[in-house]
Structure formats: structure tokens, C-alpha cells
């Protein structure tokens, strides 16, 4: 988080936090309530977000759920939705921390290679994450949607 980074940097230089670092921490702390509110809305609506995003993805990419597609059949469709749920969870971690580090460290590193080795079209997974962003936007205020959207966009960008 911003707090941890500022402290680690200051300590490495054996100094107190600078006025700029303190201002960034103040802004981070002040935004904490909204970040928690956003994460709570996403968490409470996770099943709805994942299901609607999956429906949008499968409608846009019927090849994924057609015979021979990576999400063909009930079990594989459930696996696809499980993956979307995983990325939604990572997004909430990023929102709460106010930083993309948890997204990077927990589960985005190597994702392209993993899906490529499985023969999964990464653009479809990224499309599912983008669809979750759109569904989430319907549950949040414009300001909260913008905050959350940057984390969804980060995940999508990491997949491209």
C-alpha cells in the first residue's frame, strides 16, 4: 500500500516521512471508506456480477461455449465462471489496498502463458473481466465506478 511503501522508503533512507509522503498517506486514508464501500458492493454482488458477465461473454463469444470451445459443457462453463470470480476477487483486493500490487503478486503474473498453454483464448477471458466491469458499473455511483474501473482495466491490460 501507499503507507507501507512510504515507510519502507523513508526507513531505507533513515529519515522521517516527507510532507509529500504524508499528504499521499492522508489522501489514501481519507479515501479508505469509499474503497471499502466499493469492495463491499462488489463482494455482496459477486454472484450476480460473475453470472451476468459470463452471460454477456458467452453471448458475444458463442464459440467459447460451442462444441470444441474451452467453456463447452456445464463443467467447463463453471470453470470459466470460477476464473471470472477469481479476477473479481483480485479486483476487490486492489480496491481495498488502493494499489495494483495485490493483483500482480497474487494472480496476474504468468496468466497469459497459463491460458495459452491451456488453449484458452485470453481475449475471451479479458472480455469477461471487461464485462464484469460493466456489470459492476450498474451497481456503483459514477465516482465509485471510475475508481473500481481502473482495477478491472489493469487486469484486462495485464492479459493483453
Swiss-Prot record:
Q: How is it modified after translation?
A: Contains one covalently linked phycocyanobilin chromophore.
Against InterPro entries, the record matches this protein to: Globin-like_sf, Phycobilisome_asu/bsu, Phycobilisome_asu/bsu_sf
Residues carrying N4-methylasparagine: 70
Q: Which CDD domains match?
A: APC_alpha
**Residues that hold (2R,3E)-phycocyanobilin according to the record:** 80
Q: Does the keyword Transport apply?
A: yes
Q: Does the keyword Transferase apply?
A: no
Domain of life of the organism in this record? Bacteria
Signal peptide (UniProt feature, chain positions): none
Q: An example Gene Ontology cellular component term from the record?
A: plasma membrane-derived thylakoid membrane
Which locations, inside or outside the cell, does it occupy?
Answer: Cellular thylakoid membrane
Q: Main localization of the protein?
A: membrane
Instruction: Tell me the membrane topology, using the record's own terms.
Output: Peripheral membrane protein
Name the UniProt key words of this record, in alphabetical order. Answer: Antenna complex, Bile pigment, Chromophore, Electron transport, Membrane, Methylation, Photosynthesis, Phycobilisome, Thylakoid, Transport
Q: Name one Pfam family in it.
A: Phycobilisome
Q: Which GO terms describe its biological process?
A: photosynthesis
Q: What does the record give as the function of this protein?
A: Light-harvesting photosynthetic bile pigment-protein from the phycobiliprotein complex. Allophycocyanin has a maximum absorption at approximately 650 nanometers.
For this chain, the family text in UniProt reads: Belongs to the phycobiliprotein family.
Q: Give the record's subunit note.
A: Component of the phycobilisome. Heterodimer of an alpha and a beta chain.
Indicate what this protein is called per its UniProt record. Answer: Allophycocyanin alpha chain
What is the name of the gene encoding this protein? Answer: apcA
Amino acid at each position: 500500500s501507499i503507507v507501507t511503501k512510504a515507510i519502507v522508503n523513508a526507513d531505507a533512507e533513515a529519515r522521517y516521512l516527507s510532507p509529500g509522503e504524508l499528504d499521499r498517506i492522508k489522501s489514501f486514508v481519507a479515501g479508505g471508506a469509499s474503497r471499502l464501500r466499493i469492495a463491499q458492493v462488489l463482494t455482496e454482488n459477486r454472484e450476480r456480477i460473475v453470472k451476468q458477465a459470463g452471460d454477456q461473454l458467452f453471448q458475444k463469444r458463442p464459440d467459447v461455449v460451442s462444441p470444441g470451445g474451452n467453456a463447452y459443457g456445464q463443467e467447463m462453463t463453471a470453470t470459466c465462471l470460477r476464473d471470472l470470480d477469481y479476477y473479481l476477487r483480485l479486483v476487490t483486493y486492489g480496491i481495498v489496498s488502493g494499489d495494483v500490487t495485490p493483483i500482480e503478486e497474487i494472480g496476474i503474473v504468468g496468466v497469459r502463458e497459463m491460458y495459452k498453454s491451456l488453449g484458452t483464448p485470453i481475449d475471451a477471458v479479458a472480455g469477461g473481466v471487461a464485462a464484469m466491469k460493466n456489470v459492476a458499473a450498474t451497481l456503483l455511483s459514477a465516482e465509485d465506478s471510475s475508481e473500481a474501473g481502473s482495477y478491472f482495466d489493469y487486469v484486462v491490460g495485464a492479459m493483453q
